[in-house]
């Protein structure tokens, strides 16, 4: 109930590793998050400290992460922050992991094309038939006349 939910913006630092487990699909990748600040003396942006997170995705999100992300991609990750400490070979190690709820490309830094998984990709439902894009343009001279437009009704009569 009292979980730490974070939204992190950074770059994919390692190739996503995808695995099919008994409990379902799983994927992980490292995310590099570098703070930036304005240097007033030099009038330019500077890179600050870089934090690295291991991002974990499960089930359908894992499948889509494995198929969509590459090293260097700018992404936005939302998920549960998990700080883990363990002893390895006599040394204490601390890692900051994110159990992802959502992962997407950062569209402030580039473009992306969304594609729904098809039924053959393992999704339960079949995607609806493609519909043509509606034409939002209005032909010149095709504006309806004022008398054919509905007139507003009074809000109330006193």
Curated annotation (Swiss-Prot):
InterPro entries xref list: NA-bd_OB-fold, Primosome_PriB/ssb, ssDNA-bd
SUPFAM superfamilies: Nucleic acid-binding proteins
Keyword DNA-binding: yes
Protein's UniProt keywords contain Disulfide bond: no
GO molecular function: single-stranded DNA binding
Pfam families to which the protein is assigned, alphabetical: SSB
Region Disordered, annotated ranges: 109-158
SSB domain sequence ranges: 1-107
UniProt KW keywords: DNA-binding
Top-rank taxon, per record: Bacteria
Subunit structure: Homotetramer.
Protein name: Single-stranded DNA-binding protein 2
């Amino acid at each position: 109930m009292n979980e730490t939910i974070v939204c992190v913006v950074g770059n994919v630092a390692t190739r996503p590793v995808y695995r099919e487990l008994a409990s379902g699909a799983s994927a992980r990748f490292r995310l590099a998050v570098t703070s930036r600040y304005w240097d007033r003396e030099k009038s330019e942006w500077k890179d600050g400290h870089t934090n690295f997170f291991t991002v974990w995705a499960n089930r359908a999100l894992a499948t889509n992460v494995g198929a969509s992300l590459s090293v260097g991609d700018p992404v936005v990750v939302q998920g549960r922050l998990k700080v883990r400490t363990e002893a390895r070979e006599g040394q204490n190690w601390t890692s900051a992991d994110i159990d992802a709820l959502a992962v997407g490309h950062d569209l402030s830094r580039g473009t992306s094309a969304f594609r729904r998984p098809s039924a053959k990709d393992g999704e339960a439902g079949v995607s609806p038939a493609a519909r043509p894009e509606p034409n939002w343009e209005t032909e010149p001279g095709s504006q309806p006349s004022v008398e054919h437009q509905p007139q507003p009704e009074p809000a109330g009569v006193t």
